[in-house]
Amino acid sequence: MAAEAEEAARHNNIKALYDNIRVLTNKFKKSSRPVKDKLGNTLKTAEEQMKRWVEHFKEVLNQPPPPHDANIQPAAAELPINCNRPSKAEISKAINTLKNNKSPGPDNIPAEVLKADLETSTQMLYELLGKIWEDENIPQDWKEGHLVKLPKKGDLSICDNYRGIMLLSVPGKVLNRVMLERMKKTVDQKLRDNQAGFRQNRSCADQIATLRIIIEQSLEFTSPLYTVFIDFQKAFDSLDRSVLWKLMAHYGIPKKIITIIKNIYT
C-alpha cells in the first residue's frame, strides 16, 4: 500500500495518493452502537442496523408533498443575474473560498487538491463547468454523497436522535459557489428586512437583540406582549423541493439557474 502511494505521488495521481494515505493512516474508524427499531427492540446484527438506518433516512428525506399545491406566482421579470457560463475568474475565486480540512465526497477529492495547483484546477473546471452550463446536465457523481450521522441529545440507540449530513463532491461545490455569488447580492435586496438568517453580515443574534428590545419596552410601558416560538421538526429535511423552485421563480431567479439547481437534486 505504501508503494502504491509512492507510485501515485510520482505520477502526480492525487486522487490515488489520497486514497492510499487514508487507508494507511486508518483515519476513519467505525464505532458500533446499539440501534433500536421503531418498536424499541435492539437490533443485534450489522445488517439489521444498516437496514434500519436506510429506512430511517428514507422516511426523513422523502416526506409526502403537502395536500394542497402552493399558489406561488413567478415574478413578472427575471432579476439581472449573470447567466453566462462560469468564467475562470469566478471559478478561481470559488476554489479559494473552499474550506480546508473538510471531508470530501465519494470522489475523495478534497479542497486542498484543487488549491494545490490553482491554475490547472481552474482550467479543468472551466471546461467541465462550461459543458455542464450549456447542457444543463449535472454529473451523477455530484448528485451522490456519503451520508454521515451526527449524534444529538437523548438515547443514541434511537435513530431520531441523530442528524444526517451529506458529504458531497468538492468540485461540485465550486459550481454551487459560482451560482451563489451571482445570486446573493441581487436576491438579498428582495428579501424581507426582518429576515436575518442565511444573510451576509447578519445572523440570528440580530433577531435576539430585537426581541430583547421589544420585551424591555413592553416591561417599561407595562403593555401586554405575546410571543410564539416555533421549532419545526426536521425543518430542512422535510422541505418540499417543488415549492423551492416556485419560490426562486417568485423572487425572479433566471430560469437557467433554476434548471441547473433543480437538476442537482433530481
Predicted feature locations:
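Conserved nucleotidyltransferase catalytic core and NTase-mimicking acidic/glycine-rich helix/loop elements
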Residues: E4
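Surface-exposed loop/turn segments and immediately adjacent short secondary-structure elements
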Residues: H11-N161, M166, K173-V174, L191
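Helix N-cap/coil-helix junction residues
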Residues: G252-I253
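Hydrophobic face of alpha-helices
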Residues: V54, T122-Y126, L168, G172, ...
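Conserved catalytic palm subdomain of right-hand nucleotidyl-transferase polymerases, strongest
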Residues: P34, I91, L98, K102-I109, ...
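Active-site-proximal segment of RNA-dependent polymerases
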Residues: P65-I91, N137, W142-H146, K185-S238, ...
